[in-house]
A protein has these predicted regions:
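Conserved hydrophobic/amphipathic alpha-helical signal-anchor segments
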Residues: 25, 32-81
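Periplasmic/extracellular, small/polar-rich flexible segments of pilin-like filament-forming proteins
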Residues: 59-223
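Short glycine-/small-residue-rich flexible loop motifs, especially phosphate/cofactor-binding loops
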Residues: 14, 54, 104-105
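N-terminal single-pass transmembrane signal-anchor helix
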Residues: 2-39, 45
Length: 223
């Protein structure tokens, strides 16, 4: 007596494998597109905030956050006008007495940055975007105007913008496209994170970028 044997033919198996391959390829392509979009957003943050910073200086002859004329102009909290944006990029919770928080309020009131309030914005990966003076709260005359070599936080002197919690691939691509791809030199520098939104170390030292798939970095750029 003959029995019917049920199973998949080689053609059917081949079709299934092709479909699986197409699905996996689409997923990987989609993931790469998402990564590229994040890189573009991070670069846009750096370039946009830099343009807003210099535009504010040109218009008001003062640093946002440090502007001693902000109250007369908008009713905002004044800075002390000493030429230094006091505080750290990851100040939290933000208060108007912190110049690194008033920085955002001044830029928003002036129309150079969208939104309202004093809180730092978040980047494309939900890390903090903030500013601080690389050399710390040093009188302007004492700040050495150098880009390379040993400096203040992040290896910089002067106002810098930092963006935290960046996946290694995003951080490396951002530094490569904007600067020299070297973590410890140039106008963009990175710090390997061990915690979210970390404090920026005194100098950008240590090993090179490492794309492990798990590393995260805080990138800072001299404005």
């Amino acid at each position: 007596m003959k029995t019917n044997q049920k199973g998949f033919t080689l053609v059917e198996i081949a079709i299934v494998l092709v479909i699986i391959g197409l699905l996996l390829g689409g997923i990987l392509k989609g993931q790469e597109m998402i990564t590229q979009a994040k890189i573009k957003n991070i670069i846009s943050d750096f370039t946009g905030i830099s343009a807003a910073f210099h535009g504010y200086q040109d218009r008001y002859r003062a640093l946002p956050g440090d502007d001693a004329g902000a109250n007369a102009r908008w009713g905002a909290t004044n800075g002390n006008g000493d030429g230094v944006v006091a505080g750290v990029y990851n100040t939290g919770p933000c208060v108007v007495t912190a110049e690194t928080c008033s920085w955002w309020d001044h830029l928003r009131r002036s129309g150079f940055v969208a939104g309202a309030g004093i809180s730092q914005p978040l980047n494309a990966v939900s890390g903090l975007v903030g500013v601080q003076t690389g050399g710390g709260e040093i009188p302007p005359a004492a700040i050495t105007p150098v880009l390379g070599g040993v400096g203040g936080a992040g290896g910089f002197f002067g106002v810098m913008m930092c963006s935290a919690n960046l996946p290694d691939k995003v951080a490396i691509a951002t530094d490569t496209q904007m600067d020299d791809s070297v973590r410890t030199t140039g106008s963009v520098r990175g710090q390997l994170q061990t915690t979210n939104n970390p404090a920026i170390a005194a100098d950008a030292t240590g090993p090179a970028y490492a794309e492990t798939g798990t590393n995260t970095y805080a990138l800072c750029r001299l404005l």
